[in-house]
Amino acid sequence: MNWELYSSPLRVFWRSKVWDEKTSTFTSDENLKIGKMVGKRRRPRPKRSIDLEDSTEQLISGDMVTFPCSVCYRELNKARNFLHKKHHNALSMLGFQWMGGRQPKPKLVSLHRECIISNLLRSSTYNEKVLHNVNYAFEFLWKKQVPSYFKLCDKVGETSTYSPNSNHLMIKGIAICSNNNSAWKAEPNCKFTVVNDFGDKANVCFFGLFDSHYGYAAADLASKEFQVLLLHQLSIQDPSYQMTAEQKQLINSFDTVFREEYRAREEAFSSTYKTFRTSRREYEDTHKAFAKAFWRMDRLLRLGRNETSRVRWSGCSALTCILEGGIKNPHANKDWEKTYQQGSTSLPFQKTPQIISGVLHLANAGNVQAVLCRNGKGFCLTKEHSTRNTKERRRVLYSEAVISSDDPYGLLDGHIKTTRGLGFHGNLRLKKSIIPAPQTISVPIDDLCQFLILATNGLWQVLDKKEVTALVITLFHAYKETHVPRPKSKPWPPIGLLSPPDSNIRVLFQYQPENEDIMSTADGTKGLSDSIYAEAYTHQGTFSPKVTPYDPCSTKENSSLPTIDSKQENEKELCIKNFYKGAAEYIGCELVSAAIEGGSRDSITVMVMFLNGSEYHRLT
């Protein structure tokens, strides 16, 4: 497969011993040097046998897995990522450009430092922290040894893994991996939630991450009660969402909190949002439900339940998602599959029914972010609400808040970087700036969408979306090579039969688009129409008997007796599920390890979710 055809910056390599045994086809300086030393004989080294256990040990160590740096596109492994990023920061601080890995001359480094310090002392905006950063960068480039304050602690605790079962049509495997990063954090501060058949609806899954600040009470309550608040709002707008008796009792217990005057303010809050990039209004109610659920969850945290501090109560950043899936007009799809299996070589594309796999709704407030990989390209679906965001800085400064200079991007009132979230009611001045208004967005999910990554700030402060996407693809290749049995990649049709696949995603509905460069989007009129025929063709192997009970359009149950073919198909589906679940666990742990080795100073929680697109050649 030629990776350069669709994503040249995301070229990934996995250097194994088998590759080292092959002769390189590229001309290099090493080949020229070998040619000059023909007269010298070297004793041949005994070849070491390669077995599966040895390869798995190397795979687990992570040294053989590389990914490209998003700045210079140089191949890095996890161990080199930390110092490599420090090298980039030091060069940038002293005014140097990337020199292809070459070190600038010491005299030139000294001259740059003296010039920067001289200009800094003469300026009216003198900052002691900038002076320290210049000196640190100078020491990093001047000294051959790494300064002691750059080194990491070896013991960071164990990574816990949780793999919930999912019967969703579009989810192949899911895993949540978490590490407290005990070198910097004393206790765990992240909670997660995964709910299958959300609202008693098939192929509707709710999942979310809640990263706490100043304690775990807010994140713990939000992980338990937010889904109930959201389900209540959705059930009001759509009766197909059903609530259990226990959930209704919980909602009724909050009647004394949500009175009429509060509901009037809530309605005004949810109606002030502006729509963006869409004329499809059917998702507006879903986004209003998210907004009201965030507002109500923040009001419940104001009660101070389970809070232990008398000075400052806890808060949390939240990322919540609803994945709706299904097959449109499934009976027509089965007829088309039957016609194709009878030996027909021509495909009537004009009569092929349109298949829409599903829609992903997201709502985030804070610094928990999500990246969707579609056709080998990563898209950030969330917006970071922190002092790093220029518009967020402008908003909090307009609310008479103070941003200190204790951090490269400042701290809100000298305490925290986050500018939106749930809770933070202990400090009234801080709460005035930290609002529970979420950023919401809806995007279509089709068979070109390969995986979804949800992670807390501990991962994103070390790796960006391009590096995470490339690393996940590389790790998936490595896992596939060392684990047998593995599912076979489904064949793609000849290129001439299909339109060029669109690598972008289309925004179906979005509130408050304050950052235009957060995501690349296709033309609204074009959308996903280029890949409709590709979807119809690639679904030829997905119409198994197991899919029938989960079909939302079908009202009949499959009452036929199980056959040998159906049993084999069920065993095959179970094997595939186990494979993707294991891959999600392995990749999640490796992402956590990469963040820790990259110098993360926060706890890390990563949710890895493989979608239908991971079955095809674009990823496998």
Swiss-Prot record:
Entries under SUPFAM superfamilies matching the protein: PP2C-like
Q: Which cysteines are joined by disulfide bonds?
A: none
Question: Which molecular-function annotation in GO is an example for this chain?
Answer: protein serine/threonine phosphatase activity
A Pfam family the protein falls into? PP2C
Domain PPM-type phosphatase positions: 173-611
The source's superkingdom equals Eukaryota
> Which InterPro entries does this UniProt record tie to the protein?
PP2C (IPR015655), PPM-type-like_dom_sf (IPR036457), PPM-type_phosphatase-like_dom (IPR001932)
Per the UniProt record, which residue ranges are transmembrane? none
Query: Cross-referenced PANTHER family, in alphabetical order?
Result: PROTEIN PHOSPHATASE 2C (PTHR13832), PROTEIN PHOSPHATASE 2C-LIKE DOMAIN-CONTAINING PROTEIN 1 (PTHR13832:SF837)
Q: What family is reported?
A: Belongs to the PP2C family.
Protein known as: Protein phosphatase 2C-like domain-containing protein 1
What organism is listed for this UniProt entry? Answer: Mus musculus
Q: Which gene encodes it?
A: Pp2d1
